Structures are given as C-alpha cells and as structure tokens.
Amino acid sequence: MKHLVQRFIRYVTFDTQSNPKKKCCPSTSGQMKFAEHLKQELLDLGLSQVELDEHGYLMAKLPSNVAYPVPAIGFIAHMDTAPDASGKNVKPQIIEDYHGGDIALGIGDEVLSPVQYPELHALHGHNLITTDGTTLLGADNKAGIAEILSAIEMLIENPSIPHGDICIGFTPDEEIGRGADLFNVERFGAEWAYTIDGGPQGELEYENFNASSADVIFHGVSVHPGTAKDKMVNAMTLASQFHCRMPADETPETTEGYQGFYHLKSAEMGVARSELGYILRDFERDGIARRKAFMQSLADDMNTQLKHGSVEIRFTDSYYNMKEKVEPFPHVIELAKQAMEVCDVEPIIKPIRGGTDGARLSFMGLPCPNIFTGGYNFHGIHEFASIEQMEKSVQVIVKIAELTAKKYA
C-alpha cells in the first residue's frame, strides 16, 4: 500500500493512448514502453513466469504459498488510455483532504465542480488525484495496474496471508476494443479472473452491453452544381435524412441503467460518398438484433425511394454480455462480494454501460467480472481518483486471494 500512489503517479507519465486507425498490436509504441517498465517491476518483485510478448501482452505469476491445491485466479488491467482525450504529458495534482467546492485544474480556467459532478459531495475528506485540465488522468486503467501490483506486494510482504497461484495480466488496446484479441487464456493459467477496471468504490459488474458497430455508406451522384437539377444525388443529404429518422430518445445522452442506445460516433461527408459510423448497444441479444433490423429497414426504405444513389450498411459485432458466461460460476461473484464486505465496502452490483476485456475473455473460457478502481469521469480532462478508494481496491484484491485459499483449505 505504501507505494500505491507513487506507482500510479509514475504510470500516468507514460503516454499509452491507443490508436484505432493503426492495425498493429499494440497500436502505439508508448504501450510497449510502459509494458517493458512493468515487466522490470514484476521481475523486481520476484514474480515467476514473467513474459512480455511481441504484441504487448504482459503476464506473470505469484506462486501459491499453501501446501494444498487452490484454483489459480487472475487479476487483469489494461495499459492503454482512451483516444478521446490526450494522454501525453499528464501532470497529476493531489488535492489533500477535499472539503467541497470547485477544484482548479492546473493554472487555466478548467475546474472540477460538484455542480457538474455531484459525486464529489460524497468525497469530502478524501485525498483526490486530478488532472491539470489539459489531459485525461489515466486512472482508466493505470489505477487498476497500480492496485494489482500493490496487492501483490502486500501478499509478498505478508506471507501469513494464504493464497493460491495469482496470475497477472496487463493488456494493450482495450480502449479500442482489441484488448482480448491476442490474449492467451491457456498461457495465463487462471480458472477465473477479475478485471480491475471499474469506477467508484463498491462497483462489482458481471453484466455488460452487447456491442455492435454499423457503418452506413451513402452513395450519391456528383454533378456540377450549375447543371445538377434532377441529376445530382447529394450523399450528405441522404446521410442527414437517415440520421433524422433515428430514435432521438435512444442515444447515450438520453439513456441509463439497462437502456440501450444508438450512438453516432463519426461522419465522413462528401457529395459522391458519405459515411456515418454508429455504435449499437443493448443488454439483450434480441435487443441488439432489433436495433440492426431497424437500421437495415431504414436503409431498405430509402433504397426503394431512390432512383439513383444507394444506401448500404455493414454491421460488425464487437463483444457480448458476459452475464451468460459468468452466472454459471456463482462462486466467482460471491468471493468478490464477500471480500468487499469484509473490507467494509458495500458491493454495488450494476451493469457496465460499456465493455471490458473481461467481457470477451469470459467468452474465451475465462469468467471475468469487473471490480472498482476508485476512478471517476474516465476518458476526459475531468477524470479523477480517490486515493482512499484506490486503497480499498487493493484491500479487496488481497482479500479475494485470501478467501479463495481459505475456501479450498
């Protein structure tokens, strides 16, 4: 625990922003530099089977300290930060004993305000780590990495705490949906695992969205504007017409809880060709299928009305709801709940309105729910973390390892 904050502050100085436009893995060189740093740290801690592969996947093991067989469990976090905001030259600031009110972020005009982020009201007395208002912080997911390694350090320094084999995995490119692409589950060696990639204290998640993307391509007819009457088909107009027919009350900014959505994420516009990039999210498989069918029906309807030009849609599934793969192993959830309760943390079981590496890993044979980090407002300049909640995450990780060993004693 003594090195938790120092670790985190050091980790966020690495620029590990992933790049969805790059097809290589990892998608950015900074992730590999960070992985090499972590590899040395794992070796310095004395862990075994420390391996960093050419794709930036880093794995290691803390061997069991008990004489009887205990299932190997794992803890996983990702090394990249989101492309949504800069992760370069992160300058974290520590706010000691927060007593309310606005927090100035750096020397500019940006503030972290409880008016905009009311969760701050519950954090009076906490020590907070914030940005300087120019970058994201990187608590997603470097807080998770720092917490895992601090928990491992605690287990090493306290051999009286029983534990089985503890497998550690740090992945690249999670933020661009590729974190599990080349993850070797067999090499990892755990029977089940936990991603340490959640938000506020108490979060325990084993449900997530089913996720698909839809690239909607509009083919127009380009003609000189001066002679375009009855000839031009403006693909940008088609794109506008299509989007105007999408449900306005089923977007990220209008939904919560178990509600799904359509999200227009990108647009490339031109007269001859335009493209809209959507992501589709729903907690039910039938729901995601209905969303695809609805969008396809819009395209089909437009195509029947067009004499020239056309609309096509390409759907790609990204990940599925891990619930169906985790629920058959209730002990995985119960151990995490029990660990939280012993550590005086109230479990908050709720769906992830997103995805984690664990969602895909669960479908690869590794049940893998998600546990809190103590971070807030991920992917933007108002991201921050509570040091006290980060410390609780460390305690919960240690307690999961201990309770697992005691369960099989």
UniProtKB/Swiss-Prot annotation:
Binds 2 Zn(2+) ions per subunit. Gene3D superfamilies: 3.30.70.360, Zn peptidases (3.40.630.10). It is found in: Cytoplasm. Its EC number is 3.4.11.4. Its cofactor is Zn(2+). Coiled coil: none annotated. Zn(2+) 2 binds at D140, E175, H379. It catalyses: Release of the N-terminal residue from a tripeptide. Zn(2+) 1 binds at H78, D140, D197. Signal peptide: none annotated. NCBIfam families: peptidase-T, PRK05469.1, PRK13381.1. Belongs to the peptidase M20B family. This is Peptidase T. It comes from Vibrio vulnificus (strain YJ016).
